């Protein structure tokens, strides 16, 4: 009886270990082998020598830029597969720069280059536009930066084109608007301005600089004399631009309100006469005004860009500009286009007047190509005087008054009658 009891309770060695389970088994074998670990913390008798430790460090060179990238390229010339190597002496494989010189080249200070693809940008124009755009993307302490830059001046002086050149040089793709879009259904032009402004703000939100560019604002929102109808849309356009200039980060679309602020978007507008605009819009706090009147150097620089592909010498361009000092810059572009008239006239004579439509609009050969005509200073002077005579005719002959008073052509053909020749002959 006792033996039976002891075999059940005492669990002798003959009992299978599977019966005890895994956890019990581990505890059973390790229960009498517990050890205590004693951790001793001893203070260092002397301070560590940092210099000795650094000298012994195999990675100490990481803290100092002592390598020469160009020489590294040279050393690896015979080791790296030639498939992955550019020819020596080409590009960055010219072994002349050290690593520090590479950094200084990458962080070098760029000069104020005022050309874009060979086209001239007036330094004063470029300075005004770049500073205005940069200020509007900065946080200046206790400074109220005008949101709108108004560029105005005479007709044909290249205001819009100079703006496009500066935008291209800065890598900006602006949201474009025209004054022709500022007249439609009631309230639509003001809504359109807000939509375009929000589109530019979305582009800025995506990490790319942008601005709103409105061409010829005075033609759409201005008042040109007593005969011009001043509509509600004109009022709303002026009021909208004033509101945006006052709160550039809170521009809402009609019918909705978004509490989230939008980025500040600088606005560039061009025009010929800003005195026709609503006076509170053009006050200094809202609009910074810039009168663009190109100097002789600016006109020469732009004209060199106009004739840059025609091999016209610089002294001929200077003479051309000095011969027509009162003309706009656009005059010289029209003058260059006039030189191609002879080539077109010759082509029409070869193909025949009745075949022009078939040849130009729906032809397998495509439009004709011309060899670049030779532009001499004599030919340019001749066409320039022709353009001036046509301008004088428009100013001298007031055909509208003639039509009202008599059925006559006025003095439009007097010059041709006296000389016996018409223009373009």
UniProtKB/Swiss-Prot annotation:
User: What's a Gene Ontology MF term here?
Assistant: ribulose-1,5-bisphosphate carboxylase/oxygenase activator activity
Q: List cellular component terms (GO).
A: chloroplast stroma; thylakoid
Tell me yes or no: is Signal among this UniProt entry's keywords: no
Quote the transit peptide annotation as a residue range.
Answer: 1-43
Q: What is its main location?
A: plastid
Which Pfam family is one of those matched by this entry?
Answer: AAA
Where is ATP bound in this sequence?
A: 153-160
Q: Give the UniProt subcellular location, in the record's own words.
A: Plastid, Chloroplast stroma
Keyword Phosphoprotein listed? The answer is no
Keywords from UniProt, A to Z, are: ATP-binding, Chloroplast, Nucleotide-binding, Plastid, Transit peptide
Please give the family membership noted in the entry. Answer: Belongs to the RuBisCO activase family.
**PANTHER family in the cross-refs:** PTHR32429, RIBULOSE BISPHOSPHATE CARBOXYLASE_OXYGENASE ACTIVASE, CHLOROPLASTIC
What's its job?
Activation of RuBisCO (ribulose-1,5-bisphosphate carboxylase/oxygenase; EC 4.1.1.39) involves the ATP-dependent carboxylation of the epsilon-amino group of lysine leading to a carbamate structure.
Name of the protein in question: Ribulose bisphosphate carboxylase/oxygenase activase B, chloroplastic
């Amino acid at each position: 009886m006792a033996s039976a009891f002891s075999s059940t309770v005492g669990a002798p060695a003959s009992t299978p270990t599977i019966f005890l389970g895994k956890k019990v088994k581990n505890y059973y074998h390790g229960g009498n082998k517990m050890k205590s670990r004693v951790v001793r913390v001893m203070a260092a008798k002397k301070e560590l020598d940092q210099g000795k430790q650094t000298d012994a460090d195999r990675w100490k060179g990481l803290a100092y830029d002592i390598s020469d990238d160009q020489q590294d390229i040279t050393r690896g010339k015979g080791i790296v597969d030639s498939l992955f190597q550019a020819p020596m002496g080409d590009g960055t494989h010219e072994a002349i720069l050290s690593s520090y010189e590479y950094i200084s080249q990458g962080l070098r200070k760029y000069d104020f280059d005022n050309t874009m693809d060979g086209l001239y940008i007036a330094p004063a124009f470029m300075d005004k536009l770049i500073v205005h755009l940069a200020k509007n993307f900065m946080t200046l302490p206790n400074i109220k930066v005008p949101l709108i830059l108004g560029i105005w001046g005479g007709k044909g002086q290249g205001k819009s084109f100079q703006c496009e050149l500066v935008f291209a040089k800065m890598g900006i793709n602006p949201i474009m608007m025209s004054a022709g879009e500022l007249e439609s259904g009631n309230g639509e032009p003001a809504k359109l301005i807000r939509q375009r402004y929000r589109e530019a703000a979305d582009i800025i939100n995506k990490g790319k600089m942008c601005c709103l560019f409105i061409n010829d604002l005075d033609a759409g929102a201005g008042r040109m004399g007593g005969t011009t109808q001043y509509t509600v849309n004109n009022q709303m356009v002026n009021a909208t631009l004033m509101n945006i200039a006052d709160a550039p980060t809170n521009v809402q679309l009609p019918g909705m309100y978004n509490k989230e602020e939008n980025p500040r978007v600088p606005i560039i507008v061009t025009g010929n006469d800003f005195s026709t605009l609503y006076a509170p819009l053009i006050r200094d706090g809202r609009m910074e005004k810039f009168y663009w009147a190109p100097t002789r150097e600016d006109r020469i620089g732009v004209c060199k860009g106009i004739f840059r592909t025609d091999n016209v010498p610089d002294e001929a361009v200077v003479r051309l500009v000095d011969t027509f000092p009162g003309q706009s810059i656009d005059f010289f572009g029209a003058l260059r286009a006039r030189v191609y008239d002879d080539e077109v006239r010759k082509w029409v004579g070869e193909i025949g007047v009745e075949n022009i439509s078939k040849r130009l609009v729906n032809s397998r050969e495509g439009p004709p190509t011309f060899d670049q005509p030779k532009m001499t200073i004599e030919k340019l002077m001749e066409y320039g005087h022709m353009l001036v005579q046509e301008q004088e005719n428009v100013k001298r002959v007031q055909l509208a008054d003639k039509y009202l008073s008599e059925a006559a052509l006025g003095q439009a053909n007097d010059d041709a009658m006296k000389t016996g020749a018409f223009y373009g002959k």
